[in-house]
Structures are given as structure tokens and as C-alpha cells.
Amino acid sequence: MPSASDQFPQRIALVHEWFSPRSVGGAERVVEAIDSLLQSRGCEPQLAALIDAESCRSGSWLQGRSVLTSPIQGLPWGRSHVQQYLPLLPFAVEQIDLGAAELVISSSHLVAKGVLTGPEQLHISYVHTPVRYAWDQMHAY
């Protein structure tokens, strides 16, 4: 009989809204903790986000990691002001291809939970409180 560790998926994707030095809070700490847990089990998850401005930053926990990103990454101010593209974010997260993953884990306060998965993929979503800044600054959005 196979043990539980034999059945643990090796192709795992870890999805978050964005990796940015301008946005580090509880949700980002949750992603870091999930990543650390998976790595302790011998699995380095494929990271994915709408934008990534962290993996190239010296001292970041993501330094040197490969992060799949959405088309927002290449738009003007996409990396520095991703929230300005709020109406496009649900569509953008659907453009991230995670077809190779057996397990998709999303950490979401906005749209990461909307990443597309296939019928053979298990998707577990850690859903944080709703996007408070959009309510607090509703006229800006």
C-alpha cells in the first residue's frame, strides 16, 4: 500500500495576485509559508502571479525564482501599479497556463482564485478577506 508521501503531488503551482515589494502583508506571508511547507516536502512549486517585481529583488524570498506572469506584466506601469488594471485582472489571471500542474494552490484576496484549471487538476484556494483598499478608495477604482 502506498504511503501518503508517495501520493503527494510533485507538480504543484502556487498562485497569488502579485509579488511586489510595494505590497507585503499577511497574504504574502501566507504564500511564503505555503511555499516553505511545500519545499520542506521536497517540492519546489511553480509560482504564478499577475505580475512579479520580487524575484529580481536582492534579499527577497523569491530572489532567483521563476514566476509565471500574466500579460499585465508587460503593460505600462503593470509591475508598479497593477491595481490600475483592476477591470482586466479577472481576464488576466485566466491567461496564466498551469496545465502541467497536478495541484494548484491559490492564495487569493482578489482574483487569483479565478485561475483556470482542468478537470484532472485539484485546485485548493486559501481565500483572504476581500480587497479592502478597493472599498476604502472606491472612487479611485
How should these model regions be labeled?
Residues 6-24, 50-51:
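Nucleotide-activated donor-dependent transferases that construct or modify glycoconjugates
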Residues 11, 102-103, 122:
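Structural motif
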Residues 13, 46-48, 124:
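A structural signal for isolated positions on well-ordered beta-strands in alpha/beta enzyme cores
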Residues 22, 113-115, 133-134:
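Glycine/Thr-rich phosphate-binding loops of Rossmann-like dinucleotide-binding domains
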Residues 27-38:
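Short amphipathic alpha-helix
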Residues 40-111:
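Active-site donor-binding segments of glycosyltransferases and PAPS-dependent sulfotransferases
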Residues 72-79, 118-141:
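Acceptor-binding helix/loop patch of EC 2.4 sugar-transfer enzymes
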